[in-house]
C-alpha cells in the first residue's frame, strides 16, 4: 500500500512538472545581449509575371535584444529592451544602376536625420508568455518609425504549444494558429479575421467588386528555448471580379536571425513594469502594438481647382463616349475626396453650364461628408429650372457604392421640403428606395432613418389617390425590395389600373423566389389566367414571368402550357416563344417544362404551331472565366400589329452573384386608332400612351413619357424628328473599393480600386402612317475605365503598382414593324459595334528628394462587332423587311 502511495505521489509530481513546462513561455536569460540581423522587404507586382523592375524596398539592420526586468511573481512576464542599429535602405527589386533610385544615397539622406535617430533609439517591449502585451517608445517619434518598431517587436510573437487564439500584433487583432514542435513553431495568421483600426469600404455588388486573397506564415526556429531565426512571408492579392487579370500583389517578408549572444546589461529591480519603464526613461509611454494611422503628406500635389482645370475639357458632353471621360472622372473623384466643402463649392460655382452636370455626378459620387454638404447647398430643389442637375444628383445617389444614413436622411429632408418639379419629387422617392436596399444589404436596416423611410414607402401607395404618386411609391418599393412589401405588391398586382399592376408584378419578379409565398403565387396565377377579371396583355405576360421564375409547381407549369391556344393571338405566340426560350436556354424551370411536355394534351402540334410576331429570346453576350453576361429580348404586340411592350435585359454574373445591369422597357397602348384597327379584349378604353422605363445596375430610374393622350400623340407625330429621347446620361462610379492593409512588418499598403462609366442611354419611337411602319430604338453608348492601385508611402520612400483596363462600346436594339398586311413583318436587330480594349500596368518608386523610377505598359486590341443572334424566324422576317425597303 505504501509503495502504491509513493508511486502515485511520484506520478503526480511528474505530471505537475510536465504541465508547468508545457504552460511556460519562452524566456531570455539575465545579463545576456542577443544580437540579431533583421530585414523587412516589400514587393509590389501583379500576381503573375516577371519580378524584374518591380517596385519595392528592403530595410535591413542589426537588432539587439536584452532582458531589462522580470516580474518577480510571474517569471514569464519580461520587459525587453530592443535597439535597432546599422540601418540600410535599398531596392528590393532587380534594377539596373540607372533605374535604382537608392543607388548612391545614404540611409540618413533617405530617412532624414531625425527619423534615423528615432529609429535607432531603444524601445521597450513587455513580453509575456511569448506575446507582446505592450510597447513603449517616445511619444513624439514619427508614426512611420513607431510602426517599424512594432514590426520588429511582432517577430517575437510565439507560443510553445499548438493551438488557436485571437491575438494582436502590428497588423491587427487576428485569429492565429500555432503548430509547435520541440525546435520549431509555425504561426499561421488567418488574415480574413483581422480587426484593424482603419475601416475601408467596397461596392455593394460582388459582380462590380474586388476580391482579396491573403496569407501570412511565420516559421520560428528555436535553440535551447531561444529564437534562433524567424521568417515571415505575407501576401495580399486583390483582383477585379469582372477581370481577374487586373490584379495586384503585395509581398511582405521579414527575417530575424540570431548572430551571437554576448554579455549584456544587468536586470533592473522593480515591483511593476510601469515604474521600471519610467525609471529607465521618463519620456517612454505605451504606444500600443497595432500600427497607427499615418497622415499622408503630399508635397506639390494639385489642389481641387487645379485638378478640375486639368480635366474639365474631357468632361464636356461631346467627350462622354470616349474613355478619357471616365478616366478624368476618376482623377477628379480622388481629388474631391480630399477636398473641403469650401473648395468643392468654389469649383461648382465656377463651372461652365455644359460641364456642370458631369461635375455634379463626380461631387455626389465622392460620398464624403464635405461633398454631400456642398452639393446640397449648391442645388436649389425649390426651383424647376435646375431639373437636369437635380436629377443627376439623385441618380448619382442611387448608384452610390457605399451610401450612408446621412445621404438617405438628406433625400428624406429634400422630399419633405419644397420641390419645384413633380418629376424631381418622383425621382427623390424612387431613389430613396434604392438607398434603402443598399443600406439593408450591409446590415444597416435598423438605423433610425432607414426605419423611417421604410415606414414611409410601405404606407405610401395607400396614402394617396393621385395615380402618379401611387406609381412613384410602387417604383420606390421595386428598388427597395423589402420582404415586408411582398403582400402590398401582390395587392397592387391585381389593381384595375394597368400601370399599378405592371410595376407591382415586375417588382415581385425581382425578389428571391423564396419570398414569393403560396399566397403571392395564387395572385399571379389569378392574373395570368384571368380568374376574376380581364387584364391587359402586358400585365398577364409579366405575371407569367413571375410564375415561371418562382420555383413553379408541376400544375402551374401545366396550366400555363394549356393556356396557349386560348390567349389573344399575339399573346399565344409570345407565351409559346417564352416556353421555347426556357427550354433552349435551360432556365431553372426547364426540367419541369420537359416533364409537363411528356403529356400530349399539354404538348401537341396545334398548341406549339401558333404563329405571330411576338417573341422572347435569351442569349449570351459574353462568356469568360471571370464573368458571364446574358441578355434577353421580349417583344409583345397587339393583335393589330402595334407594339405593346418591348423589354431588353442584360445581366452579369460573377463570384456567385447576379447583377441586373440594364433593363430598358418601351410600352405603348391605345394606338390602334392610328391605323383604324380594333383593340384587343380588355384594352378598348386605354388612353393613348407610349413611354420608356430604365433599370440600370439594379436601380430603377424614373420612367420617361413619349406622349400621353390622343392630342399629345398627334402633336408629337407631326413634330417628331425621329431623334431619340435621352433616358439617362452621365458618369457612374461602378467599382469603388478602398482599404488599408496593415502589414506585420509595420508598413501600410493602401489599396484603391475604382471603375468609372460614362453612359448615354436613349430611346425613340417613330410612326409612318404613309408607309404603315413603326420603329422603336434603344441606343446604349458607354466608355468604361477601371483602375486599381496599391501604394506604400513611408514618408521617406513610396512605391506603387497600378493595373487597369478601359473600353468604349455601343449597343443598339432596333425593332421595325411593317403593318401594311397581316401577318405583319417584325425585324429585331441587336448590334454591337467593333470596340477597342486596352489593359494597362504601371509601377513607380519615389524618394522625397525627387528621384523617381516608373514604368508603363499597355496592351491594345480590337474586339470585332457583331449582330447578336436571335431566333431563325426573326432572321427570315428581317430579310423580307429589308427586301421591301430596297
UniProtKB/Swiss-Prot annotation:
Q: How does it assemble?
A: Heterodimer; heterodimerizes with the protein disulfide isomerase. Interacts with apolipoprotein B.
Provide a GO CC annotation, any one: basolateral plasma membrane
Q: Name one Pfam family in it.
A: MTP_lip_bd
Q: Which UniProt keywords apply?
A: Disulfide bond, Endoplasmic reticulum, Lipid transport, Signal, Transport
Give the molecular function GO annotations. ceramide 1-phosphate transfer activity; lipid binding; protein heterodimerization activity
Lineage, top-rank taxon, reads Eukaryota
What pairs make up the disulfide bonds?
174-194, 440-445
Single GO BP term: phospholipid transport
**InterPro entries this protein is in?**
Lipid_transp_b-sht_shell, Lipovitellin_superhlx_dom, MTP_lip-bd, MTTP, Vitellinogen_b-sht_N, Vitellogenin_N
Q: What is the role of this chain?
A: Catalyzes the transport of triglyceride, cholesteryl ester, and phospholipid between phospholipid surfaces. Required for the secretion of plasma lipoproteins that contain apolipoprotein B.
- Coarse class of the primary localization is endoplasmic reticulum
Q: Where in the cell is it found?
A: Endoplasmic reticulum
Q: What induces it?
A: By elevated dietary lipid levels in the intestine of the juvenile fish.
Which PANTHER family does the entry link to?
MICROSOMAL TRIGLYCERIDE TRANSFER PROTEIN LARGE SUBUNIT, MICROSOMAL TRIGLYCERIDE TRANSFER PROTEIN, LARGE SUBUNIT
**What name is this protein filed under?**
Microsomal triglyceride transfer protein
Residues of the signal peptide = 1-24
Start and end residues of each Vitellogenin domain: 28-662
